[in-house]
C-alpha cells in the first residue's frame, strides 16, 4: 500500500475506520 501524501493516508484510514497507526504499521510491514 502506497500513498501519494499523508492526506491520502488519513482518507484511507477514515474509510476503513482503523487507527492511523495501525495502517502505518501495516504499511511498513508489507
From Swiss-Prot:
Coiled-coil stretches: none
Pathway entry: Carbohydrate biosynthesis; gluconeogenesis
Main EC class the enzyme belongs to: lyase
Required co-factors: [4Fe-4S] cluster
EC number: 4.3.1.17
GO molecular function: 4 iron, 4 sulfur cluster binding; L-serine ammonia-lyase activity; metal ion binding
A GO biological-process term: gluconeogenesis
Superkingdom per UniProt: Bacteria
Catalytic reactions on record: L-serine = pyruvate + NH4(+)
Keywords: 4Fe-4S, Gluconeogenesis, Iron, Iron-sulfur, Lyase, Metal-binding
Cofactor: binding comment: Binds 1 [4Fe-4S] cluster.
Subunit record text: Heterodimer of an alpha chain and a beta chain.
Family to which this protein belongs: Belongs to the iron-sulfur dependent L-serine dehydratase family.
Protein name per its UniProtKB record: L-serine dehydratase, alpha chain
Organism whose genome encodes this protein: Anaerotignum propionicum
Lineage: Bacteria, Bacillati, Bacillota, Clostridia, Lachnospirales
Amino acid at each position: 500500500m502506497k500513498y501519494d501524501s499523508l492526506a491520502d493516508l488519513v482518507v484511507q484510514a477514515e474509510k476503513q475506520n482503523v487507527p492511523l497507526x495501525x495502517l502505518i504499521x501495516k504499511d511498513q510491514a508489507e
